[in-house]
Amino acid sequence: MQNETLQNWLSDGPLLIDGGWGTEFQKRGLPLGAHPDLWNLENPDAVKAVAKSYVDAGSDIILTNTFGSSRFVLANHNAADKIAEINRRGVELSKEAASEAVGRNVRVLASVGPTGVMLALGDVSPEEVYDAFVEQIEAQKAGGADGVVVETSSDPQEMALAVKAAKSLGLLVVASGTFDSGKKKDRTMMGATPESFAQAAEEAGADAVGSNCGRGIETFVEICSRMTAVTTRPLWMKGNAGLPKMVDGATVYDQTPEGFAAEALKVVAEGASFVGGCCGSNPAFIAAVRAALDAR
């Protein structure tokens, strides 16, 4: 399916993405502070189980446990020598889960997160960052990824390098920013607005643009509206389950699955072609969105 276009994917209407992965890993025993991507090699059954839980909840698209699998991030966990293996296996595990869907086609987009290095401060060169993305995405393609999502982006320059790396390898790519900074909480950490981010993503060659994380799903209607004003690319929206609160030392989110689903429908009505969940969401939230979409 690596030769498909997003228009083929969207022929039957909006597509449902998966939800959060981190808390699902913690439920399965991932220690706080441990790097989840290492589980692709150390605990693959748990990784596949999380992916399968979203397939069973009704996701049309699931991601991969590769968000922090660039050479820069893995070096912090003494795993830089396992880049290819971790990325390839992460995709393979999601593909295995997707293949178990009954009577429908579930696609897999490989997750590519920020490198953690600062281009603006001269920590590394753009060429080094681009090469790191090519290295990561090559392994994801080898694992069978149907495309890539460059997510939780704050730096449009880094995002553009990742998009161009994916396109150089012939893959579909979604560019997704996180807008929770600034006086109005509507900019990325590096100051990009939804409009400027969407324009930069389109110029870099992204097949779809959007947002994930940062704030609750209820704030994503505005992000949709602002991006629609400047781009005709399909919109990808993956919001959090409301606002986080500390309860007995643990972070909990204040949204219910039903409330989340109602907000997700508003995001779709505003023009989103892809909708799902991020922090605080789980398979119950995605199942609720599935039911709401099917009942329209």
Where are the predicted features?
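Domain-level signal for soluble alpha/beta catalytic cores
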Residues: 1-296
